[in-house]
From Swiss-Prot:
This is 70 kDa neurofilament protein. Residues 450-615 are annotated as: Tail. Residues 499-612 form the LTD domain. The keyword Chaperone does not apply. Residues 96-449 form the IF rod domain. GO terms for molecular function: structural constituent of cytoskeleton. Residues 100-135 are annotated as: Coil 1A.
Length: 615
């Protein structure tokens, strides 16, 4: 909290020719006030001017001004409640400080003029003495009363400013901490996004590998099926080969059987030959016993013919049997040889295919093992990333909860501070109104009949120097009286200033203006049923010389809901579905304010009027 004390000292010394008389009344006047500036410095100004009065006395006036003001920074919290509000307060402070300087200068000039007039107004000494005796005590009482009130007000302002500065510093620290936390949160979100992208890439690689594994498995299954088919073909060919081997064995057995039959038949033939030879011998013996040569010749010829026929028939039958057996045997041997060659070729081809399939299966199994190992590694990496992601999500949720709690706490503190600031602004507004009233009273006092002409005659007219006193001496009305040769005494008479504000609301339809902030922060709309406000316009007229407009964008107001349209300088207070007017820094303030809600056709649907009358 910074305190500035401004002190004006005016001293007067009067010397008369012929005799020295001490001046009666006030030989010095001092005034002090406390304000709250933003800079520090010290100004000392003095002047001395001798003059001669009409009564022949020499008077020397020494006027000195000591101005000191300073600013000190005290620790506190909440450095930035609202940049707009603080700038507004700063501007008002600077304006009030400048007004204080001007008023003090004018007050000093006014006192100087009155001192000059003392030499001219000796004839009024009795009346002034009477006024002094009559009003002196009342002035002291009023002065003490106002000094007590001002001291309490200063203490209250000092305590409030100290608490405000503490809260400002705390707000600054929390805002810095919030910015750091938000930066960490952004970094965490960036890392989270990178992890998400990496997980997506890993999932894509995993999907590709799973697709490749599935394709390899399908290839293995097809190769297994092909192998099974080849095995079935090989088994079938082995069965056929076994069958052919059995057929060959059967044919060999049949061949041996035929050989045996042939040998048997040959033996039987030899036996028949022997039998026939024996019969022939018997017949020959019978023939020999026949004495007839013709009979012997006949039987010999018949027997030879029979033997030849039998021999031819037997040879033909043996040749036929031999040819059939040889043909059948050669056919079977040829078929066996052809089948064995084909089977050998199939077996060789199957062996080559089996070898190739085995090598492919070995390669696929090795690759499958590598892919399974890589898949397991990727799954472990994916699990690790998921765990890290879950951990970061939990941390982010915890930090988010902490941030939300901090923000809620800060908003509560900010609301309380804004409420205090609003109270201070109301007090400040009342002080400004009282300052304006006091200024008018002083101007009226200066312009009383005869006073202005006397001042202009003695010291000359000085324009723009008729306003007096500071914002601290508010709610007061000033008067003056002078007694003695060089004495000035001040009397404060209590005055009052009141402000009366009236509000009037009208609406045509379901939508109405619920509230229009007197400080120009926001305008609140409410509706009794659902209404589409897209294209509607708000027109706010301030003291008939300033117009603020805002066109509502895409907005559908639900039944029973209230929406606030904030000015640009107060958009930090917007919440939820509230709107912000980017075109208007403020909605404006004044004594006569009219807020109108128009639909898209330009028809007035609602009206909110605010009138303030100062009394």
């Amino acid at each position: 909290m910074s305190v500035t004390q401004k002190k004006t000292e005016i001293s007067t010394t009067t010397t008369y020719e012929g005799e020295s008389r001490p001046s009666s009344g006030m030989s010095g006047f001092s005034y002090s006030a406390k304000i709250h500036p933003r800079t520090s410095g010290y100004i000392n100004r003095s002047s001395q001017s001798p003059f001669r009065s009409s009564m022949g006395s020499n008077a020397a006036y020494t006027r000195s001004y000591d101005f000191s003001y300073g600013a000190t920074a005290m620790p506190g919290r909440y450095a930035n409640i609202s940049s707009t509000g603080v700038n507004h307060v700063k501007a008002n402070r600077e304006r009030e400080k400048q007004d204080m300087r001007d008023l003090n200068e004018r007050f000093a000039n006014y006192i100087e003029k009155v001192r000059f007039l003392e030499a001219q107004n000796k004839k009024l000494a009795g009346e002034l003495e009477e006024l002094k005796s009559k009003w002196g005590k009342e002035t002291s009482a009023i002065k003490e009363m106002y000094e007590t009130e001002l001291e309490e007000a200063r203490k209250l302002i000092d305590a409030t400013n100290k608490e405000k500065i503490t809260l400002d510093v705390r707000v600054t620290e929390l805002i810095d901490q919030l910015e750091r936390q938000q930066k960490d949160l952004e970094e965490s979100r960036t890392y989270h996004q990178i992890d998400q992208e990496q997980i997506a890439r890993q999932n894509q690689q995993l999907a590709d590998l799973e697709g490749e594994i599935s394709m390899l498995r399908r290839s293995i299954e097809s190769l297994e099926k092909e192998k099974m088919r080849q095995s079935n073909i090989l088994a079938k060919m082995n069965d056929e080969m076994e069958k052919m081997r059995m057929d060959l064995n059967n044919e060999t057995i049949n061949h041996l059987d035929a050989e045996n039959r042939r040998q048997t038949l040959e033996e039987e033939l030899e036996f028949q030959k022997d039998v026939h030879a024996q019969e022939l011998k018997e017949l020959a013996a019978l023939a020999y016993r026949d004495t007839t040569a013709e009979n012997r010749e006949f039987w010999r010829n018949e027997l030879a013919q029979a033997i030849r026929d039998i021999q031819q028939e037997y040879d033909a039958k043996c040749d036929q049997m031999r040819g059939d057996i040889e043909a059948y045997y050669n056919l079977k041997v040829q078929e066996f040889r052809t089948g064995a060659t084909k089977q050998n070729m199939e077996v060789t081809r199957n062996k080559e295919e089996n070898t190739k399939l085995k090598s492919n299966m070995t390669e696929i199994r090795n690759r499958l093992a590598d892919l399974e190992a890589r898949n397991a590694q990727l799954e472990r990496t994916n699990q690790d990333l998921l765990r890290d992601l879950e951990e970061k999500d939990r941390q982010n949720e915890l930090e988010s909860c902490q941030y939300k709690e901090e923000i809620t706490k800060l908003r509560g503190e900010m609301e309380s501070i804004l409420k205090e600031l609003q109270d201070l602004m109301d007090i400040k507004l009342s002080l400004e109104l009282e300052i304006a009233a006091y200024r008018k009273l002083l101007e009226g006092e200066e312009s009383r009949v005869g006073m202005k002409q006397i001042v202009e005659q003695v010291v000359g007219a000085r324009p723009n120097e008729a306003e007096v006193l500071s914002t601290i001496l508010t709610r007061s009305e000033g008067g003056y009286e002078a007694t003695g040769d060089s004495q000035i005494s001040m009397k404060m008479m209590r005055g009052e200033l009141a402000a009366k504000t009236t509000y009037q609301r009208t609406s045509k339809g379901s939508v109405s203006i619920k509230e229009a902030d007197s400080q120009g922060c926001f305008i609140a709309l409410e509706t009794k049923k659902e209404e589409n406000l897209t294209g509607w316009k708000i027109v706010r007229k301030v003291d008939d010389n300033k117009v603020y407009t805002y066109e509502i964008p895409n907005l559908v107001l639900k039944t029973g809901t209230v929406v606030k349209i904030w000015s640009k300088n107060h958009q930090a207070q917007a919440r939820g579905d509230d709107l912000v007017s980017r075109e208007n820094d403020t909605w404006g303030t004044g004594s006569n304010v009219v807020t109108i809600l128009q639909n898209e056709k330009g028809e007035d649907k609602a009206n909110y009027t605010q009138n303030t009358v100062y009394q």
